[in-house]
Each structure stands twice: as structure tokens, then as C-alpha cells.
Curated annotation (Swiss-Prot):
Name of the protein this chain belongs to: Recombination protein RecR
Coiled-coil intervals: none
Family matches, as Pfam families: RecR_C, RecR_HhH, RecR_ZnF, Toprim_4
Organism name: Bradyrhizobium sp. (strain BTAi1 / ATCC BAA-1182)
Keywords linked to the UniProt accession: DNA damage, DNA recombination, DNA repair, Metal-binding, Zinc, Zinc-finger
Listed NCBIfam families: recR
Superkingdom per UniProt: Bacteria
Amino acid sequence: MAVAGPEIERLIQLLARLPGLGPRSARRAALHLIKKREALMVPLASAMQVAIERIQVCKTCGNIDTQSPCTVCTDPRRDPAMIVVVADVADLWALERAKASNGRYHVLGGTLSPLDGVGPQDLTIDALVQRAHAPEVSEIILALNATVDGQTTAHYITDLLQEANVKVTRLAHGVPVGGELDYLDEGTLSAAMRQRTLF
């Protein structure tokens, strides 16, 4: 038996598709939006309409922005010699929030995952190889997750870049800032020991 009209049920169903929102959370979010119609729902709908009309994928790096090439690619303060390779836009944004890189980026659109049917043709690896051959590029930084799929992707890209005249590096893996050794898994501790640095 339906508790609300089909329009409200549709709103709940659509909200439930968002990451981190299940049916109960979606219902609460829908009720909150409806209660705050003028203060929240109307501005949100307007912002979403603008996003639909203006946001696009950068043809150079794969970032999302209101222009292509994106703001990062056109920033003259960025180091054109360095390309940071990430799996998705969320990873790019995380590095930007941390102010961890002054280079340019390349968004793969995921990682290789044979079990999920994701092969090289499904990612922007060919475009990365083309960019790596540009004369101004001297380093490719693989900022991929330390998962099996992330490491598989990193090895695959490294093999493809053998002929390019670039240094290929990857992010260090190990003990997080504020982390306690007792709570870390064996793989993380092992990687931290192998990648230790002078103090």
C-alpha cells in the first residue's frame, strides 16, 4: 500500500540510487526536501538544471567542469611536465583538496577489472599514452588505489609507457598520518617498510 503519491515515491526511488543512500535514508531526505521546499528543494532543482546544461567532461584530462579544456588544464601555474593519473574525478578532487599536486591530471574512468568486464578499451588509457609522448611531459604519477584492480591497472600502464621518454612513479603506500601500527593490516605495514624514507 502506497503511503504517498507516485511523484513522491519516484523522488524517493531516485534519491535511493545515490551512493550512500538506502531506501530509509532516501525517504528521510525526500521528507526534508519537501519540508524545506523554498529554502532547499527549489534551489537544488535549479542547481541541478544548471549542472545538466553546463557541466561537461574535459576533452584533455577527463575532469568535469563548465568548460573544456577544464580549469585545471588551462591553469598556466600548473606544471605541464607532470601528469597525475587517477581512476575517477573523485580522486582528482581529493588530491586537489589536499593541495598534493601542481601538475595536470588524467582521469581513466575506472580501473581494469577482468571480473567486472572492464578492459583497456573501456578506459582512457590510449589517450594517456598519447599525452605521455608529448615533448613537455617528463613524469607520469600513478595515483591509483592500492587494490588489486588499481595495481593491475598501474602495471598495465607502466608496460605501455616503456617506449615513452617519461619517468613513471606511483604514490607511496603505508602508514597514514595519525595511524597506529597495531590497527594496520599486514599489507599496509609491509608496503610501509619497503617504501621507508630517511628521517
